[in-house]
C-alpha cells in the first residue's frame, strides 16, 4: 500500500500526509491504510479549491492554471494540510476578519463566497452514515459538511453542494480511479474495511500543564501518576474483588441459596387488558405493492419518478372514504391529506419536467397530522426558579395490553418465501482471505435460502425508508417533503422490479440531538380489511381508496384497496439503526454457522454441503404449545433471520429488559437440564424484573409466550 500511495499521489501531498501522521505519533509503515486515507482526503480538499477564484466584482469564477490573470482572489482558504498551530492561526485570522463563529474542530476549508467553513469527508462506507457521524461530532450549523464516497455518491448540508457539477465530477472521477487502481493491486478490500467511525477529540487529547497536575493530585491513594492508575483500571478484574466484598456483607443481607428443581420455576405472567396493537414504522404482512417490471422510464432510480410510474399502473382509484376511523384523531384530516397527495402528484404530472423532490403545501390538515406548533414551549430553567410549585408534569402509566394472535401471524408470514429475490450474493460482504472458501460456500447456501424470504424484503424496505427519511430530514428541515416508500427486487426470472408501498410526509426536522423526534405521516396501500382485526389497527385511520382486480384460479375478482394512514415519529438514532438492518442477515448466518461447526466437529470433517443439501433431515426451529417445532434447514435459516429482523423492527426498552432478564432464567433452566444442580437466590426478584418489561409491546409479549412454552417442555 505504501508503494502505491507514493506512486499514485503528488509528492507534496505524500509529504504533508507523512507530517500529519508524525504529528499524531502514527507509523505510516504500519498504518498504511490510514496513510492512503489521509492522502486521498488532502487531494480532495485541493481539488475542491483548484481553479475557483473571486473576481473584482465579488463573483465566483473558474480559471484554468495557464490563465495569465493572476490577481484574482482564491475563493477557498485551505486549512487542511497545515500543522495544527498554523491551521488554528489561519482559522482565528478568518474569524477576526469575517466575523465568522470560531469552530470547535479544525475545518478543512473556508469559502470566501459563502462565508462559511467547510468540512470535507471522504468515506468508504455509506455517505449517509458518515455524514451523520460528522454532523454529530461537529454539532455546529455554521460548518458546512460535504461528503464524497468512492462509489460516486455525495451528501452535503441542506443538499447545497457548493461547487458546480463539473468540479464535483472531477473529484468523483479521481476517487473512482483511486478505487480501481487499488482493486487492480488487491488493496481495495483491506482499505475499504479499515475505515473506523469518526474519532472525537478526546481520543487524541493529551492532558498537560495545570490539568495534568490536578489529575495527578486527584488520584486514589497508592497511585503516583495518571498512567499507573489508567493501567490498573484497564487491567482490573472485578470478580474476585466482588466475592471478597460479599463475604464481608452484613448478616442482615439474606442471600440463602435455594436449590432449583424441575418444580421450582413457574410460567411468566403475561398482562391482561385489551389486545396489543401494531406499532412497527411500516406495514409488514399487510403491505401491498404497486410494481413496475424492467423499469426504463426517464429518471428511473429517482424515487419521485419511480413512484409516479408505479401509481400509473393502477386504474381502480375511486373517491376515498373512511372505513376505520382513528378513535382519538381528527379523521377527516387524514382523508384530506391523502386527497392532497393525489392532487399534488397530478400537478407534478402536468408539469413539463418532474422535479426530483416534492415539498407538500403546508395545509391545515398536514399541520395537524404532523403536529406543527403542537410542541409545548420550552422555557429556560433559570427563568422558573422562583415558581414555588414548579414540578414535572404528570405522565400516565402505559396501559397494559394482552398478547394477540396477529403478532404470531406476522412472524409466520415473515418466515415465508416470496416470489421475488431481495438480495444479491454480495449483500453480506466479500471474502478477505483464501481460508474463507468454506465460509463463502456457507454464505452462498444461506443466501439461497433467505434471498426470497419476506423478512429479507422487510430489511431492504426498512433500509430504504430510513435512509430516505434521514436524508430528507437533513436536507429539507423546514419542508413537508413527500417521500415515496420504495423497494427494488428481481423476479424469479431475473427481471428488475421497482415497488411502491405508499408515501411518507415528513414534518419539521431540526434534529440537533440523536433523540430529537421528526414526525411523519405514513400512507400505505393494503388489501387487508381493517374491520377483521380492529384492535391491531388502533393507531391507524384506514381509507378505502380503490378496487383492485386480482387473477385467481377461478378467474378475475375485485378486491377493495385500502390506505392505512397514521401519524408516527422517529429520531436520528432510530433512523441510523433502521438504515443498518443488513447485519440481521449476518447475525442469522453466524447462528447457522455455529450449527454447522457443531455438526462438523462431531463428524470430524466439514459438513457444510451435507448440512444444506440433505433435504430430508429436520432441525429444531422453536417452541410452541404443541412442543418443539421442527423444519428443514431452509426454514431454520428463515426463522432465525425473521427473529433478528423483528428484534430490529420492534426494538424497544421493553425488549432490551426482557431479553436481558429472561436470559438469566434461561441459563439456570439450561444448567438444570445439563444436570449441574443449579442454585438461586431471590428468584421472585428475577421474575419481577422479567414481568415489569411485559407492558404492551406485541413482540415482547410473543417472546414471553414462547418462553413459557419452552419452560413447559424443557422441564417435563
Curated annotation (Swiss-Prot):
Name of this protein: Polymerase acidic protein
Segments carrying motif Nuclear localization signal 1 (NLS1): 124-139
Enzyme nomenclature, EC number: 3.1.-.-
Main location: host cell
GO molecular-function terms, A-Z: endonuclease activity; metal ion binding; RNA binding
Gene designation: PA
Motif Nuclear localization signal 2 (NLS2) per UniProt: ranges: 184-247
Binding residues annotated for Mn(2+) 2, in chain numbering: 80, 108
Cofactor note: Binds 2 manganese ions per subunit.
Cofactor names: Mn(2+)
Pfam families the UniProt entry points to: Flu_PA (PF00603)
GO BP annotations listed: cap snatching; DNA-templated transcription; symbiont-mediated suppression of host gene expression; symbiont-mediated suppression of host mRNA transcription via inhibition of RNA polymerase II activity; viral RNA genome replication; viral translational frameshifting
Family classification: Belongs to the influenza viruses PA family.
Binding annotation for Mn(2+) 1: 41, 108, 119-120
Known function: Plays an essential role in viral RNA transcription and replication by forming the heterotrimeric polymerase complex together with PB1 and PB2 subunits. The complex transcribes viral mRNAs by using a unique mechanism called cap-snatching. It consists in the hijacking and cleavage of host capped pre-mRNAs. These short capped RNAs are then used as primers for viral mRNAs. The PB2 subunit is responsible for the binding of the 5' cap of cellular pre-mRNAs which are subsequently cleaved after 10-13 nucleotides by the PA subunit that carries the endonuclease activity.
